[in-house]
Every structure is written in C-alpha cells, then in structure tokens.
C-alpha cells in the first residue's frame, strides 16, 4: 500500500460483501438498467455485494451526524436542528460517478421511504460557454478555473443551513448551461453532490466543498482503463447524436470510426488525463471511501478511511 493510502483500511470485495446480511437488491433489473450510464456495467450482484453494505455504512455516518448535532445543541443550549446529510462523489470523467450517484439516490429512497433524497451534479456550476469563450477558457472546460466555485459554495452553504437553494442545469446534448433553468432544493434529508471537482476549491484555500460533506466517495480506476471507457462512451454518444442534428456531438457523428477514436483519444490525453492527474486524483485521499474498479467496471477493492 502506498503512503497515500496509509490512513485507509483496504477491504477486498469478498470481505466487504459479508458486512451486510444477504437481502434483495431493492430494485429490479429494469430499474438498474435505466440508471446505468452509457457503456457503464453494473449488475444486481454488484448492488447486493457492494452497494447494500455501503448503504449500511452511510447509515452509520448519518446516525453519528445526528448524535453530534444533538450533543452540540445541548452544549450550546440551542434548539436541535437536523441538517441535510450531504454525500460527495468524485472521480474521473467516464469512471462511473453518475451511475453510482443515481444508484445511491434510488437505494437511499428505498431504505428511507419517508426521506427526501436529492441529487445535483457540479456540471451545472460550469461557467456558460459564452463566458468561457470570452475568457479564453473553452479549451479548459472541466478544469478548476472553468467552474463558478463561489456560486457552488454558496449553494452548499444554503443547503447545509436548511434554506431553499437553486442550481443551474447543464445539458450534455448542447454542451452548455441551459439558460433560465434552475433546479430547486428545499431542505432535503439527503443530498448527493456528484462531480469531478467535489474535493477541489481553487478560489479559497481556507474552505473546501468537502467541508460541507458528511460522507464522501471517490471512484477510482487505472487511467488506462478509464481511457478505454471514455472512448467507448464517446462512440456510443456519436451513435445517438446521428439521430439529432441539434445535438452538440452531431458535428462529429459522421467521422469514420478510426478518426472518431483518434479524436477521442486526443481529447482524453490533452484534456481529461491532464485534469485527472493534476487536479482530480490528488484529491482522492480527501474521500471517506474509495471504490476501486477493475477493467470490467467491477469494484474489486474498497478503501475506508481509518
């Protein structure tokens, strides 16, 4: 184990799955398919072996958060205020963050039927393309400087204080923020925050997004595997874009397969790999839990912070 993981306990898949009594998966195969991202791969067995124990662990942290909040209120002689439980999920582009986030949202909704479980992606806090063009940052989209971190931190602060909060909405079809559209959040019991940058903050070194998280997950994999997944996903997106001339990716949909692969590989190496190595992976040890994926997308190792 490298020094980076010295503060983590390594748990094999075989050991991890014993931490939850065998039970039904709480969702159907059709539901699982509907929340699985393009070219991701997850099975009902993965839900039972990996995600049901994870739901149990999140419940442990939730109870601890409530107990601490209760004790603080007694100490300060203030009324007890239960705050939203915020879960941050990070990792590279194409590593499977969205699938994990949607699955956790569904499972938490099933295990906490009286709770409001919401999901927000940090894509909505990217600056609009026009602003990025004006600032000469369009080719840096996804890098730390392309996010409105002040707006994102204000959003999390409002959520944590039980206030109604609004998040911009991003569309991958148009590759931009949707004008005049907001997603509203009214004091949810759980909020899942998903994005490549959830452990970063380049604006203010004294405050990190992760300061607002009650639990956090990093989805990890070898960069060569992620590159393969990224290219496979890009090709799948192009197939879908052929049916929609208004889709941002329609301009690439007519490329010969070899050229499309070369284009995707170049984007991976010049943008996504650089972003991963310089800004995303270095934040990995800020997570409470690291889920490591093998080449077939299956989670084979789990690292839990000691």
Swiss-Prot record:
Organism: Streptococcus pyogenes serotype M1
Pfam families: PRK
Keywords, comma-separated and alphabetical: ATP-binding, Coenzyme A biosynthesis, Cytoplasm, Kinase, Nucleotide-binding, Transferase
Listed pathway(s): Cofactor biosynthesis; coenzyme A biosynthesis; CoA from (R)-pantothenate: step 1/5
Binding site for ATP: 91-98
Transmembrane segments: none
Molecular function GO labels: ATP binding; pantothenate kinase activity
EC class name: transferase
UniProt name for this protein: Pantothenate kinase
